Amino acid sequence: MGNWLLPEGLADVLPAEARRIEELRRELLDLYRTYGFELVAPPLVEYIDSLLSSTGSDLNLRTCKLVDQLSGRTLGVRADMTSQVTRIDAHLLNRAGVTRLCYCGSVLHARPADLLSSRELLQIGAEIYGHAGFEADLEIIQLVMDTLATAGVRNARLDLCHSGVMRAIFDADPQASRHAGDLCTLLREKDVPGLAELASRVDGLGEDTVRALQALATLYGGPEIIARARRELPAVPGMAQALDALQALVDAMPGVTLSVDLADVGGYGYHSGVTFAVYGEDWHDALVRGGRYDDVSRAFGRARPATGFSLDLRKLAAGLTPAEPARAVRAPWGQDPALTDAVRRLRRSGEIVVQVLPGHEQGLDEFVCDRELALQDGAWTVRTL
C-alpha cells in the first residue's frame, strides 16, 4: 500500500475547494455575527464522558476513542460539536439570560453515515440557549434559510416535525415506549407493513397506539398535514401542544417553501420539541438539521432551554456552483525597494499579488492574473493584460 493513501472516507481538500470552503466559512460566521451570535471554539478531543453526556447510542458509535497518556482516561474525538457548545454555555459562561453561540470546526466519524458521506466533516452551526418559546425556534430557522441563501442554494425546502408528537404517543402507552427504537426506525422508513408486523408481536400494545403509529407513517406533505394529524392522531396529553407549536411556525413563515413530516423522528431520544431538516435542489440528503433539545444541558449541572442547527460546510461547498478563479496581479520578482513597496501597498488594499519566481514565468495556479505590475516611466504601475 502506498504511503500517500488516506483511510477510507477521508480526503484532502485541494486549493480551489479549500478557497471556496474558507470563503463560505467567513461569509456565514459574519452573517451569524449580524444576528448577535458569539463565536466559540471547543477542543477537538475531550473526555468521552463529557462528549457523550445525554446523547444517544448513535453518537457513541460514531465517536473515535483513544486513551489519554497523561491521565489514563478515555478520550473521544468529537463526532458532533453541539454537546461541547452546550457545555460551554451551561458550565463556563453560566449566563442567566439568552445566549447565542456559533461555531465551526472539524468533526470525525468512526463510520460514514452512508456510502456517499465523508468521515471528516467541517461542522458549522448556531445555538440559542435560555429561551423556551417558539420565538427562538423561529429565529434559528430564519438563520438557517439565510445561511442557505447566502451560500447560493436554490429552491431550499424546510421540512418540519415535532418530537412531542411521538413522545405523547409513547407516554400514553408504556408498552410502546419499551420498543421506541424499533418503532422510530420503522417510522423513519415509512414502513407501514413493518409497523403492523411489530405491533402483532408486542403484547399489550393499545389499538389506538397501533392506529396512531400507522397514521404517522403517512402524515407527510404540505402544511395541511397538521390539520389531518389533529383528526387522525389520538387526543392524548401533549399532542395538541406539539401540533400547535408546528402550526405557529408555519403561520410565521408564509414565504418559506415548507413541508411537514411527522414520521421524521430520527432524533426522538435527543430532541425535545420542534425539529427540522432543510433540503436543496440537487442534493441527495438534507443539507441542514436542527431543532430543540432542552434536556441536554442537564448533564452539565444546569438545565437550559436550547435550540439550534448544524451543517457540513464541505458538503455544502461541494454541491455549489464552482467559484470563479480569483483575480490577481502578476508582479516580477526583484529586490527593488520601489517594487517591494508597490507590492506591499497592493496587498494591504486587499489585492492578490503573485510574484513570478525566476524560471517559472509560465507556471499555472488557481489565480487568473488579469493585471500586471510593470515599471513605466520609472514608477511601478498596474496595467491590464
From Swiss-Prot:
InterPro entries: aa-tRNA-synth_II/BPL/LPL, HisRS-like_core, HisRS/HisZ, HisZ. Pathway: Amino-acid biosynthesis; L-histidine biosynthesis; L-histidine from 5-phospho-alpha-D-ribose 1-diphosphate: step 1/9. GO terms for molecular function: histidine-tRNA ligase activity. It is found in: Cytoplasm. GO terms for biological process: histidyl-tRNA aminoacylation; L-histidine biosynthetic process. Keywords: Amino-acid biosynthesis, Cytoplasm, Histidine biosynthesis. Required for the first step of histidine biosynthesis. May allow the feedback regulation of ATP phosphoribosyltransferase activity by histidine. NCBIfam families: PRK12292.1-1, PRK12421.1. Heteromultimer composed of HisG and HisZ subunits. This function is generally fulfilled by the C-terminal part of HisG, which is missing in some bacteria such as this one. This is ATP phosphoribosyltransferase regulatory subunit.
